[in-house]
Amino acid sequence: MTGIIEADYVIVGAGSAGCVLAARLSEGGKFKVLLLEAGGDDRPTKNLSQFASNMMIHIPVGYSSTLKDPKVNWLFTTEPDPGTGGRTHVWPRGKVLGGSSSINAMLYVRGQAADYDGWRQLGCEGWAWDDVLPYFRKAQNQERGGCDLHATGGPLNVADMRDAHPISEALIEACDQAGIPRYADLNGPDQEGATWYQVTQKNGARCSSAVGWAPLRSSSSNSSRVMVF
């Protein structure tokens, strides 16, 4: 990067939050945003040394390879834990556009409504379930369609598993026979029992915050208001 860069806002880290923040600040075309990311672009490029790492980001079955790839992962470790005999543990964090949303398992799982209400009771105003639900809905493009808990038209695509493996289906059926109820929506009003995960994927590929929110993915005039380094 050479020369002087002028920006109204500087965001350090183009991860799960950074991409969203850059997109929101640039929506009206009023502000120029500088988005800084220590890792590189998440998309495959002509750079062969980086091509495979970036390709695996977007292929769902390839996510496990990113968990040990220093090109897209900071490979942090925890402090020695007495509870596990003094061992340290790998703590994956994304080092790429999209951050950890570019290397996670793509599972779309909301917290229990009671947990959010508990935070509000402890004094966290604005964090009750009824306060956060509109933002869950605003962010979401639920392929099943909209309802009280879900919405369509948002940047984060949420889909059902494309390949219903028979062993997984047999496990859910076994749970049902054992008295563990089967339910239809992992993020529905009742979250006790066994069901299929939903995933942040679109057309069989990962939908990270870089894919969903980063303005450089957009053809709108606002995309020119965000500079990514």
Task: Give each language-model segment a name.
Residues M1-F229:
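N-terminal redox-cofactor-binding region of secreted/periplasmic oxidoreductases
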